[in-house]
Amino acid sequence: MNLSHKTMFMTLYIVFLLIFGSYNATARIGPIKLSETEIVQTRSRQEIIGGFTFKGRVFHSFSKRVLVPPSGPSMRHNSVVNNLKH
């Protein structure tokens, strides 16, 4: 391998690491849930929400809104587990 191939592969490797690292960082933040009143107020003031909005959630990495809490076991799941005989 000559020097230009090594340089090209190192550049691609670094770019791959940067892209993969930034994807993991943004994926951990997760979607942001907006209430319908916030969406209506934002539209009425003609402000732009930064990011892609889908069913009341905004998908972007730098958020100023309330994060959606992670989902846990449901009450139905808890009742089934609690009723099991040990």
From Swiss-Prot:
One of its GO terms (cellular component) is extracellular region. It is found in: Secreted, Extracellular space. Expressed in roots. Keywords: Secreted, Signal. One of its GO terms (biological process) is floral organ abscission. Residues 1-27 form the signal peptide. IDL1 is redundant with IDA. Involved in an ethylene-independent separation step of floral abscission. May act with RLK5 and HSL2 as ligand-receptor pairs. The N-terminal signal peptide is necessary for IDL1 function. This is Protein IDA-LIKE 1. It comes from Arabidopsis thaliana. The lineage of its organism: Eukaryota, Viridiplantae, Streptophyta, Embryophyta, Tracheophyta.
